[in-house]
């Protein structure tokens, strides 16, 4: 068989040109150990609830690790299936709320968020989180009532509205400073004329007129997905700490 002949030639070539004993000895050596994560042994004194289910599932692990390094315990919960746990702040990441919009409209979590926001709990949302925290979300000409933290209405579009890297200066009640990240969405958000926007964008589209990060009380939400290396984690965790210690 021609294939057997080719394999025999290959075997002879390797035997003549490769130090097989050395290769085999190296194969027995253990691989270098993975570096240990440099999270200091710091006891958590504040708890942040992170929405995690099929509606909210886009998170950077580094962001969650940064919260822990800043002294926060992470408690996951599902706006689709459960209630809000006992927490000092909340984080709603990106995902696909439009695929679960009817369930979210009826969710216990949705109906409780406005009161928690008015009470001063720090609540942060990104993209899908922004859409969820607005007054309503229009999809295929049907309007769904949502959390109503912000005087803004979101409309799903068939056309891509934004895709690319972002950079902005944030001046919000719960964090300040430069924030970098990216945006990717098929929706537009129409804000009321008296809406307050915290991010002045140097790069990226944002919500409207070069601004992103709508805020009300201690709640902030943006189209930007913040990069963990630039997000003011300590500010946000300290805001949760102040809320807990009132």
Please place each PLM-identified region on the residue numbering.
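Internal gly/pro-rich beta-alpha loop/helix module
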Residues: 1-40
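C-terminal and late-domain segments of enzyme folds
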Residues: 17, 42-44, 56-74, 79, ...
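Hydrophobic, well-ordered secondary-structure elements that form the walls
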Residues: 90, 126, 147, 184, ...
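Phosphate-binding active sites in nucleotide-utilizing proteins
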Residues: 46-118
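Short, surface-exposed amphipathic charged segments that create phosphate/polyanion-binding patches used
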Residues: 1-12, 88-93, 164-166
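Short, glycine-/Ser/Thr-/acidic-enriched flexible segments
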Residues: 54-56, 81, 96-98, 131, ...
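Cysteine-nucleophile active-site neighborhood
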Residues: 97-172
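Short acidic (Asp/Glu) and glycine-rich catalytic loops that position anionic groups and cofactors
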Residues: 92-96, 129, 217
């Amino acid at each position: 068989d021609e294939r057997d002949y080719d394999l025999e030639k290959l075997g002879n070539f390797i035997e003549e040109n490769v130090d097989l004993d050395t290769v085999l000895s190296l194969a027995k050596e253990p691989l270098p150990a993975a570096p240990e994560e440099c999270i200091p042994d710091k006891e958590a004194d504040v708890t942040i609830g992170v929405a995690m289910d099929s509606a909210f599932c886009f998170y950077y692990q580094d962001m969650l690790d940064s919260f822990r390094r800043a002294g926060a315990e992470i408690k996951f919960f599902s706006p689709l299936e459960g209630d809000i746990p006992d927490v000092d702040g909340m984080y709603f990441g990106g995902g696909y709320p439009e695929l679960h919009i009817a369930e979210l409209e009826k969710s216990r979590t949705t109906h409780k968020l406005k009161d928690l926001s008015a009470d001063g709990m720090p609540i942060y949302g990104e993209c899908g989180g922004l859409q969820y925290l607005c007054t309503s979300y229009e999809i295929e000409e049907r309007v769904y009532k949502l959390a109503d933290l912000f005087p803004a209405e979101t409309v799903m579009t068939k056309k891509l509205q934004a895709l690319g890297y972002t950079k902005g200066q944030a001046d919000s009640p719960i964090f300040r400073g430069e924030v970098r990240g990216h945006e990717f969405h098929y929706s537009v958000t129409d804000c009321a004329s008296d809406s307050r926007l915290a991010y002045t964008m140097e790069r990226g589209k944002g919500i409207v007129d070069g601004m992103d990060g709508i805020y009300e009380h201690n709640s902030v939400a943006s189209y930007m997905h913040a990069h963990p290396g630039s997000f003011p984690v300590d500010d946000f965790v300290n805001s949760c700490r102040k809320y807990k210690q009132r």
